[in-house]
Amino acid sequence: MGINIDKIKTNVKKYLDEKRYRHVERVAAAAKELAEIYNVPAEDAVAAAYLHDVAKFFEIRKMIDLVRGKYPEVENKISQTTAILHGFAGAEFIRNNYDMFGIDNEEILDAVKYHTIGSENMSTLSKIIYLADAIEAGRTWDGVEKARELAKKDLDK
């Protein structure tokens, strides 16, 4: 049985405001496009994209409780900012709520976990989510157009 994207969308929407949900939709569109270019299952990329910010608005205490003892190599750093912590907390929240999201694929969970900071030896899916988050259509930073073009040619540049 495949991933139920509609179920993921419905449940993710419960945790995000409208502005953040629109961002997630744009990330999903960018991730799907990149997945098709790099021969990654589009379903995995879309699922990871919809899930990547699920913990964005969790209270800091909840985020810390979700990750405590699981990531000692980054635990001191991640507790300092929700911008980093929400990826790790989101991965654990998804893992702990299989009934809600239907995801236990470690590659998808890693893509959620590392979407803000990256990691060594990232999978192609993780690179796609990392980049899709940065280059989605709502982003307007200097150089984003060039980054969008480059992402379609090489995920490692």
Give the positions of each predicted feature.
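N-terminal glycine-rich anion-binding loops that anchor highly charged ligand groups
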Residues: 23
